[in-house]
Amino acid sequence: MPIGRKGRALYRRYVKRLLDIILSAAGTVVLSPLFLIIAAAIKIEDPGPVFFRQKRIGIHKTTFNIMKFRSMRVDTPRDMPTHLLSDPQRWITKIGGFLRKTSLDELPQILQILSGKMSIVGPRPALWNQYDLIAERDKYGANDVTPGLTGWAQVMGRDELEIEDKARYDGEYAQNISFAFDVKIFFMTIGSVLRHKGVIEGGTGEMKKEKKQ
């Protein structure tokens, strides 16, 4: 086995998980004051649960309940992608809009990285009933990778991507996992968050639609 391939295999099997544990544990401690501030803001605007749990697809198409800061009203229809709601903005709270735009609603997933259900970098976990995305990911082996807080498809377009493109990017990641690739995605994520790149409430596939026009 060439040194490069051997190194990637070792990273994928051992080092990646070790880094997930170290970084998520540190993040939990450092970000705990921010967690409390966000929790208070959610409670003040729309009394109800601070966290939102939803059934998602994990590695090898197992399921788990992803955890986020609640960004939508308590009476929002469950298990429905935002882009399928007739009027997404109607359901999103004011603090929720800010959390979603800055991706701060995803922070509780640090705890799920620590527990091993997720990784820092990997394909974003699909809803259990996003059958089209799950089927497309099967073509590229992307369902056999631990889902991530951020991923290659996220930084390459996020909500702007159509299902086929999103699955293809997830497949590219699954076939090329390495320390260098993860670092690249991590820093690209920071840039995307600061620019609010790819966030389209109620939309999907906008990038391809623009190209066709």
Question: Language model features by range: what are they?
Answer:
Residues 8, 76-94, 98, 124-131:
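Cytosolic-biased juxtamembrane loops and peripheral soluble domains of multi-pass membrane proteins
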Residues 2-75, 112, 179, 184-213:
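A hydrophobic, helix-centered structural microdomain
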Residues 90, 102-105, 178:
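Residue-level signal for the nucleotide or nucleotide-sugar donor/cofactor binding architecture
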Residues 49, 111-213:
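Hydrophobic structural segments characteristic of membrane proteins
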Residues 97-119:
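Short, conserved beta-strand/loop elements in beta-sheet-dominated catalytic cores
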